[in-house]
Amino acid sequence: MLDHSCQVQRHPHAERGLDLYETPSVAVEALLRVEQLPHSIWEPAAGRGAIVRVLRNHSHNVVASDVFDYGALDFVGDFLKQERMPVGCEAIVTNPPFMIAEPFVERALELAPLVIMLLRLAFLES
């Protein structure tokens, strides 16, 4: 007999304290199929670089930052305290920490001419 129950599992790359959930590459690939992104992009919640790798594989220049150095960053910094975009960047593409997604969206809209947030649909309910 088949078990059709739905089980929720914690993402294997989740880190509770910093709300790190790596974005599946298929999500970024899907984005690239429907959006024409500028060449230079800032990923301010880069984590270990999941989004960054896909964008760079598609020849985008990506500046990667995060509040914690996971080893794949151009600089460490708190996005919510940034006063300007990195030089040359024309867009923000990120999967922000869910617990502070709303302030991330607000800050990104203040800083960038183009903002793409990869968020769970549950964000729309909050």
Predicted regions and their residues:
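Class I S-adenosyl-L-methionine-dependent methyltransferase catalytic core
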Residues: 1-126
